[in-house]
């Protein structure tokens, strides 16, 4: 896959114990994406161990985005992940 945008990570995204590398992995290689607001996206993916991770990405424009929330996916999102894979 090719990505032509830049994705950064805000320090606040790491407060739930997800590493920066795993937050970026889940946000870049997401399985499900949903628009939360005009400039915010919920992205559901997996960390390097295969655990489901939820991220919120702020779209800044000009191809730039920032992950500002990352945590182990809550149960309410699990169905979205597994429904998408089948």
Residue map of PLM features:
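Ribonuclease/tRNase effector modules and their secretory precursors
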Residues: 1-86
């Amino acid at each position: 896959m090719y990505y032509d945008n830049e994705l950064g990570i805000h320090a606040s995204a790491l407060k739930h114990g997800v590493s920066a590398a795993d937050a970026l992995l889940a946000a870049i290689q997401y399985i499900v994406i949903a628009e939360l607001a005009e400039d915010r996206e919920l992205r559901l993916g997996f960390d390097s161990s295969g655990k489901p991770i939820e991220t919120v990405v702020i779209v800044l424009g000009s191809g730039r985005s920032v992950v500002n929330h990352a945590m182990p996916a809550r149960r309410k999102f699990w169905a979205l992940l597994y429904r998408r894979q089948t």
